[in-house]
A protein has these predicted regions:
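Exposed alpha-helical structural elements
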Residues: 13-17, 74, 78-82, 140
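Glycine-rich catalytic cores of cysteine/serine-nucleophile enzymes that process amide/ester linkages
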Residues: 6-70, 96-105
Length: 157
């Protein structure tokens, strides 16, 4: 069994700033559940939300790489349960500042995109990277984990 994530190569000003600060090609991470729902901590709506299309709220023409993380059925159930419990929680702007200042700034009741993915993996007993806390996980780090496997690329419409 596995879960998938969508790694966006955003084009907006905010996306370019995120890519510069995190020194990577990705500006956003969304979690793709197996029932065609997509969960993302999205600064555009200030919360963790559910969408049904990878293009929802994203600029047309944005490249998106899809990655997969293998896990057992119990792990996948724990992952999904944790992700769904976070829907509606606020966006973690303080956590983004933590990347800029290279500090541990974050709020444990709020999420930014890749932090939510990493925390969900940890909740399911799937560590993405050794010695890296969820709040330290950028979209770039999520994609270079030995647990993530590139599947394909798409472009938003």
């Amino acid at each position: 069994m596995s879960i998938r994530i969508a790694q966006y190569k955003g084009k907006s000003f905010v996306s370019r700033v995120i890519k510069k600060i995190t020194r990577g090609e990705y500006s956003h991470t969304a979690i793709m559940l197996d029932d065609n729902r997509i969960v993302e901590a999205w600064e555009g709506c200030d919360e963790v939300r559910i969408i049904t299309d990878l293009s929802d709220g994203h600029k047309p023409g944005t490249p998106v790489d899809i990655y997969e993380v293998s896990m057992g059925s119990r792990q996948e159930g724990n992952f999904r349960e944790f992700v769904e419990a976070q829907v509606g929680k606020e966006y973690d702007y303080l956590g983004l500042l933590g990347f800029y200042f290279n500090s541990g700034l974050h709020n444990e009741e709020k999420w930014f995109c890749s932090e939510l993915f990493a925390a969900s993996c940890l909740h399911a007993d799937v560590g993405l990277l050794n010695n890296v806390a969820a709040y330290q996980t950028s979209p770039r780090l999520a994609s270079v984990s030995p647990k993530t496997k590139y599947i394909k690329s798409i472009v938003t419409v």
